[in-house]
Amino acid sequence: MPHISSASVVALLSCTFMSIASIVSAGEAIPVKRVPAEWEPQEAIWLQWPGSWEKSFETSFARLSNVIVQYETLHILYDSPLVLSEAQSSIKREGGDPAHPNIQWHWIENNSAWMRDNGPVYVIEDSTMRVQNWAFNAWGGAFGANIPFYLDNQVSNQVAKILGLPIEAIDIVHERGNLEFNGVDTVMLNWSVIGDSRRNQGYTKERANTDLKRHFGVSKVVFIDGVPEGDLTNGHIDGIARFINPTTVVVADCGGNSQCHAPDDPTHAIFDAAAETIAAAGFTVIREPIEGTRNYKGHIFDTNYMNWLVGNGFVITVGFDNPETDEAAKVRLERYFPGRDIYVIEALDSWVAGGGVHCHTNDQPAMSTIRSPVLSD
């Protein structure tokens, strides 16, 4: 499989968009049931404000919030009046306005600050939008049996009630952070997550393939496999491979200055195998280099920028307080998402705890996406 350099990305994407346009103009049917891609217009972004054991995330959450409200509505869930007060103080401290007209506050009890995973999946079917609530058990108990998750399991129901949308309960344990949609016909995910026996005992890939097609309206399911070193989620797709348009996927690549650079490193092998699997499924693959490491609070980890959030006119990715690699990642994201403003927000405490910007946020598609998919900017 050829390696496509970031320098070739702009020309490649131009050709890709022309190819997509020709497919649509040729009259290819758009599925009646689908999940909009993340780059499509959004109604809002949601997050659960960190409290108690996650208070160290507050500064990065405030910075994240202050960017989002410049572009779209932000719904913030808080667990108690104390958490609300702390959240508002943090936003002020970082130069924002907690009374900004684009912020809506909701007192909804929850257990954690990872709303990507326990929050809603939005599905369009027959010209209506519904909320899917997939079962959640705190990543298969990755953080121990004493970590509660009952309240997190109810958040999707609460969101649906606020929005006045119908709710569909899915009796399969899974997280939205392990779902990548191209908005047309494909879902991409890591089998090591949904097939984890701590989540779904006895679940088979054949059954998953059938279930995913039925629940999402896709005709193609692409499974990668493997758990990167130190990944507490068991390998969520949003740290490994991301769609940037309906036919192009960016896949992490272990560079020479990364911990996983050795060819026989298990993480290196997982990323390479993912790229090969995705290319074999018919998608163009761009490799996203991991160019350095970071030592923070005794933890040494690679600077992996894959965990980005796409919003209305912007992209935010996790920053590692490493000026060289942070800036290089920003330049690459400008190529992947031309026309959008790019932000790199330091979130080291989140990363040490197991995730980044994408993991904390949950995007709500705009009602306009009911009509037809938006293929690119």
Model-derived features: positions:
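Signal peptide processing junction and immediate N-terminal pro/mature segment
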Residues: S22-A26
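Bacterial N-terminal signal peptides
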Residues: V10-A21
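Bacterial N-terminal signal peptides that target proteins for export
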Residues: M1-A11
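The feature marks the mature, well-folded catalytic cores of soluble enzymes
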Residues: G27-S376
